[in-house]
Amino acid sequence: MEREKGVASRYRPFVDSLYERTPANSTVVSKKARERLAEHHAEKVMRRYDEDIVRGWNAAVRTFRTFPTIFRAQDFTRSKFEEALAIVRANSFEVTRADGVRERVLVPLAHLLVHDTSSSVPCVKMVDDTFVINVDEHRAGDELSCSHGEYSDAETFARFGTSAVYSEENNARDVITFTFPDEVHLKEEIGSCGPAEDIGFTRDGASAELMCALRLVSANATEWSEMRKPNFDLQSLKNRPLSEESEVAVYDALFATLTDLLNSYPYSDVDDEHLLRGDRLADDERRAVKIRLREKRSALRALNTVQYRGRKALGGVLFDKHFSHIMPTRVKDEL
């Protein structure tokens, strides 16, 4: 996809360098070689690889059909997909999540290369056998950018390509799920709070399941001793805090998550609305922007509700003491 976009793609230089470093034909396994793998562990690995190809291609086809202008089917063939998947496999590493699901991680080469921030145009070049990439000016901690545009195909795919819901209307559950990092060693206890798909944010703020999970991971040693008693009902944490100290930590996590999410969008609501008022978007591009805007609005409504409930639960004085630097006044939902 990024290779087809040419110089307009901010990721094209990185993708090209992957292909240059790992020629596709170097990853091909011949039929004869496969036969020799029979009854060996490597045969299972190859079978998993084949299954990944089938699953990935089926998901890609669904995406092409949903966004035909962004992802033109004639640009993406099964052979190209298999080639790209082979490149990713050759330049990535596999991790297994706490729930047993395997994921393959491709570290963006942009973070491994020397950067030149003096240019505002996408550019990659070799200087003394070193890749140098020109990127836009940025502040420390900002995501590096190598191109300009009102929307990005890669961004759209990254946010919505693996979603089961492609609609500008609210989905059936209208929830932004919250995933705990793998280093949280309370997966079984968190499971007592409710199904993973219910742990998240809705327009009504943090779900009861999310509040329960956050209260679990925010508990101090004394509170944990209490919760380990046989008669303690973990589900009661959906509706009641453990202590003032722990509840402050819970709301700190809620605000940090929602503000990070809202700040992660590369375009403002005004930008998206401007795009939607114009006539430059194809139908599927318009749908993608609406999906993004809907998610953003859901997050903003959730933030407003969390702020209201936090002030009510902790009291105005305590709430302002801990969170006035984040939100000195109530967030106004103008959407």
Feature-to-residue mapping (PLM):
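Long, positively charged leader/targeting segments at protein N-termini
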Residues: M1-E334
